[in-house]
Amino acid sequence: MNQHPDATSYQDEVAAGPGGVMTDDVGVITGDLTVRTTLEDDGHSARVSVQYTGAEEWYTLTGSPAPVPDGGLAAYHRDLLGRVRRGQAAQAT
C-alpha cells in the first residue's frame, strides 16, 4: 500500500473473500481484484473503484463515494481492503 501520509489515492491488489464485492455497474464481482481509493475534492469523502486485476474496465464500488473517517484516507483504505478480503458483497460503506 502507498504509505505517504498525504496521499490522495491508494491502489492495491487483493483477493476478494467469498461473496466478493458489490458494484453499481455489474453487481457482485469476485476473485483477484485491484482496489483504488481516491480522495474527493471535498477532502471528506472517498471514491472507490474496483477492477479484475489486469483488466482495463473499472467499476464503482456500491456506497461510493464514502465518508473518510478521522483516521484519514490511508486508514479507510486499509479497512476497506480487510472488508474486501472478507467478501460478503463488501461495499464502500
Could you say what each language-model-derived stretch is?
Residues D42-Y59:
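A short, structured beta-strand/loop element
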Residues M1-T37:
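Negatively charged, low-complexity tracts enriched in Asp/Glu with abundant Ser/Thr
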Residues A7-T8, E57-Y59, P65-T93:
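Mixed-charge, Lys/Arg-enriched low-complexity segments
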Residues V26-A46, H77, R83-R85, A89:
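A structural signal for beta-rich interaction modules in eukaryotic proteins
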